Every structure is written in structure tokens, then in C-alpha cells.
Amino acid sequence: MHSLSLRRLLTSVLSLCSCSSALPNQRRSNVTSHVETYYSVDGATHAEKSKALKADGYRIVSLSSYGSPDSANYAAIWVQEEGPSFEIIHDADEATYNSWLQTWKSRGYVSTQVSATGPAENAVFAGVMENINVANWFQSCELENPWAFSNTTGNVDVVVKGFRMFGTPEERRYCILGHENVGNEQTTIQYSTPSFTVNFASTFEAETTKRFWRPSRLFLSEDHIITPSFADTSVGKWSHAVDLTKAELKEKIETERAKGLYPIDIQGGGSGSSERFTVVFAERTSPKPRQWNVRGEITGFEDNKAAEEEVDSIMRRFMEKNGVRQAQFAVALEGKTIAERSYTWAEDDRAIVEPDDIFLLASVSKMFLHASIDWLVSHDMLNFSTPVYDLLGYKPADSRANDINVQHLLDHSAGYDRSMSGDPSFMFREIAQSLPTKGAKAATLRDVIEYVVAKPLDFTPGDYSAYSNYCPMLLSYVVTNITGVPYLDFLEKNILDGLNVRLYETAASKHTEDRIVQESKNTGQDPVHPQSAKLVPGPHGGDGAVKEECAGTFAMAASASSLAKFIGSHAVWGTGGRVSSNRDGSLSGARAYVESRGTIDWALTLNTREYISETEFDELRWYSLPDFLSAFPIAG
């Protein structure tokens, strides 16, 4: 890239030096921290203000450079708080900036803010580096595709801390900064590329429909394309604004300050009459800390106190490392709980989990379907050998499907292999659009069945087993068809024996007051409104499922205590009475595990499956908790 003039080069370096000072190495999280902002200022003014604010004990928390590289403008937010020493640079060409970056990196400093403006061959850079403890961090400012950033991190999971799309519409460049994701923080960032531009309005709506999610940064390009970043941390009340002029931004800051909200991110783009800003406001300038809480009792072990300390320690290590906010663990003996603990690792605006709170169960829901079939067989209302489609009056396109019986469906050997033909339980939108109504209404379970029977099987029934969500869905339809009672009503009357087990409804609006938040960062197209392009959270249809139609396979909710009690008299896997085995459940926003082990039955529920890795969860369910149960004898 071309070098800047000597005058600008000296200005950037002198400004860098004037902003250097050492502060204590411990930040404070203060709701009422004094906040200073400026925007639409040139480099000299930015340097002057930086020097004065540093002298008064302020730290920079948001930095944006924009406009022409020959006369870049700056927007910044400073907060008066203690913290580690830091360095600042601005108006630096690529060579100067990279040299500065490497110099301070070699001294243990970490990049925390980065911005750039101008065409790829003549861009100028600005940034902040702090003397903080981040084991691994990565920054690349020559990316031609933002998705290529993941190739630079060496498989280290990172949180994007800084971003700028610069260059020209014909020759984009992306500057991305990421810090190693310690604690499994959940964030998203939605990139635009020359071939795809994010619809900000619909993306913003989808992301903030996820409970407790908020915008953290609204990065802005010179041509006013917003790259939004979202987080699930808590900063109290918040608001945002986009496409603001300088005068509108000033007015907005004053209006929000009167409400007790302060700017925590300002991004600028354009120059002259095209200068525009995005801004995020919040009650707090830094996220709330998480707190550890435990509820419930352990009553049935020889040493209840020691057992309590051990299992609480196991769960705390797992939850803090993996960022899991809500969980339960329960143990039962002959249908009576001898331990029920609920765990919360969350901010103070989330509910503290109680032992009787209910969690989405994912595929653990299938054991209620198996118990229903067992009830029908034991009451001579159904046989395991009954051909299912003939019973329901269907004529499948594939004649082999006429041989599918109840046992095939229970054993996942009916001829459906989701690795070959897809999983209908997550295809409600596609199925609805294939109907004569062309997606004018959501698909029902009956629509799914009729869609499937018109397709060829993936293998001959009985040849082998392939895990299927469709098989239990079909069996739940059989239950309703035989009894004349809706499946959920049948469960309540004949299977649950008073246990609090219920349907987890699809719509996010049904869960705004839930104590348990089924957490997922993912969104997807809405299957309840198949003609809409609207995005919805993963647990609320974004995974493609309409849960009201999937009750037999993965849509039920209950507490860990209810699960442990239930498997004391019902097969946790298979069909019939209690048997030593286990069942696993995984779904967007949910993870559950139940096991009958020797004489005891135990259950684990989590409000997310987005922990660090499956290895972490496997260690918990297959080793840590079973080892605990082996090490602490049951009383009596």
C-alpha cells in the first residue's frame, strides 16, 4: 500500500506516544461509569481528546474511523474506569500500523479495537492495544472474504471483537479481530459480501427475538452496509439507532441519556452529506457478571453432605467452563427422588433454577411414546406386529412400506434413513410448500405422513436400524387414531401419573416469561409461516420443526426429577417396564440424558447444547456423574 505523507505519519506516531500511560490492571464493572463520546472529528481532534481523557482516567471502549483516508474522521466512546495500560494509534498506513501492532504484541499487549477506512491500496488504520490476559488472539486486515477469517485461527474458537468492511464495493476488504472464547461466550456476527448483503431489519428482529440477546456492535461500512454483532450477555435495558446524521445522533444521545442509557458503541460511515452513524445504548457499559446458585436437596445417600459437595463441584466445573446457564440433576430410587439439585450460572436478571422447573427434553421425549405403545399393547388395543399404514388407511407409493409394523417403528428399522432422504421432522416448511396450498398454512403431522408415504423407502423394513424422528411421530398419530384421544391428552390420562410433563410450544411468544430459557445462537426460516422469509430462533422453529406436531419424538418438557421418577417404572430405552439402559436427547436449545443404572434412576437436563464440544458433555454424563454415583453409596 502507498505510504502516508511524512506529516501524517509523524502525527500518528506522536499521537500514539501521547496516549500511553499505565493504569491498575483490574477493571471495575460500574453501571454509573462516566461516559464521554465524540464523533465526526478529525485525527488531530481525536488525538487531543484522547490525551485529555486518558489523563482523567478514561478508557476507550468503542472506536470507529471512517471517511476519506486523506482526512479520516473518528467516533469514540470513553468510560471512566480503572484498567490495564493501553496504547492507541490512528491515521496510520498499513506498514506503520502493522509495525505498531507487532511491537506491542511482543510486549504482551492485545489488540482490542481496530478500524480502517479507504480503498484497499491506500487504507488508513486505527486501533487500541491493551495489556490484558488473552491467551490467543487473531487479527487479519487483508481478507477478501470475511468467512476466510476462520482459516487464520488454527481451530481456536474465537469471539469477534472488532470488524471493519473497507475498500470499495468492487474491491472489498475485511479487517477482523478475534479473541479466544474462554467460557464459551455466545455471539453472532452477520457478514455481507459482494454476492450477498444482510437484510439488517429482518436479521435484527430474529436475533433479538432470542431472549436476552442484544446488539453489541453495529459495524458500518462507507456505503452504509451494517454488519451487526449480537451477544447474549446482559447490560440492562438497551436501545439502538441506525442511519443517523450527526445532528440526529447528538439528539439521540441526549434523549437516551435522560432515560439512563449511555452509548456503548458508535460506528461511522461516509463523509460530508453522506456521513451516517449507528449507535447502541445500554444501562451498563460492561456486561453483568454471572453468579452461581444451587437449589434442592440430597437426602438418600449415606453421606448426604459429602455427596452434595461432590456433585455440586462437578456441575459447577462443567457449567462455568462451558458457559451453561441452567441445569438440573436428579436421582430416584423406586420412583422416589433421593437427590434433586438445580444449578444456575447466570446473570441476576435470569431466573434461579428450581428442581421443579421444566426443560425441553429433545429426544428423551420418545420414552413417553414407547410407554404409550406399551399401554396400548397391554390393553389389547394394538399389536407389535400390526401393519401401521394399513391401520391408518394409507397406500404407500413404495409397496415395501405396507410391511412396516409397530415394532419396526419402535426399533427405527422401518426403512427411513435421514442420512439418505432427510429428516421430515425438520422439513415442515418444505413440506408445507409442496402442498396444493403452496405454504399458505403450516404443515401438520398428517401432512408429513402423506408426504412420506408418497416417497420411496431408503431400505427394506427390517434390514437394519437407522435412527428416525419420523417413526415416533407416526406412532403418536397411531395412538390418537386408535384411542380417539389427542396424543397429549392420552399421555396425561394414562401414562404420566401426575408428573408435570407438557408440550414445549413452538412460538417464541409463548415463552417470554419462561423461567428456563432454551438457549441457542442459531436462527432459521419460520416453518409456522412457510411463505414468509422471516427468521426465528432455533428452538422456536428455526430448526425447521413445528413442535406441536412432534410431541411423540422430541417436543416434550419436564424436570430432571420427573424423568428420574418416570424411568423407575418405564423403559428408558425400548418398550416395557424398567430396564438398565439410557436415552439421550439433543435439539436446538436443549440437551437431556436419562439412565437406569443398577437400582437407581438418574436424569440430567441442560438449557442448551451449545457447550464447547460433545466431548465435554460425554465426560459429564458417562464419567463424572456415574463416577459420583459409584463413589457415594445409597443409604440403607
UniProtKB/Swiss-Prot annotation:
Residues 1-22 form the signal peptide. It catalyses: a glycyl-glycyl-[protein] + H2O = N-terminal glycyl-[protein] + [protein]-C-terminal glycine. Gene3D superfamilies: DD-peptidase/beta-lactamase superfamily (3.40.710.10). Keywords: Disulfide bond, Glycoprotein, Hydrolase, Secreted, Signal, Virulence. The active site is at residue 363. Its EC number is 3.4.21.-. PROSITE patterns: PROKAR_LIPOPROTEIN. One of its GO terms (cellular component) is extracellular region. It comes from the Eukaryota. It is found in: Secreted. Glycans are attached at residues 30, 151, 383, 481. One of its GO terms (molecular function) is serine-type endopeptidase activity. Pfam families: Beta-lactamase, BTRD1. Disulfide bonds join 141-175. GO terms for biological process: effector-mediated suppression of host defense response. Residues 512-540 are annotated as: Disordered. PANTHER family: BETA-LACTAMASE-RELATED DOMAIN-CONTAINING PROTEIN, D-ALANYL-D-ALANINE-CARBOXYPEPTIDASE/ENDOPEPTIDASE AMPH. Serine-type endopeptidase that cleaves Gly-Gly bonds in the polyglycine linker of host plant class IV chitinases to disrupt their chitin-binding, and thereby plays a role in lowering the defense responses of the host to the fungus. Degrades Z.mays Endochitinase A (CHIA) in vitro, although corn is not its host species. Belongs to the peptidase S12 family. This is Polyglycine hydrolase. The lineage of its organism: Eukaryota, Fungi, Dikarya, Ascomycota, Pezizomycotina.
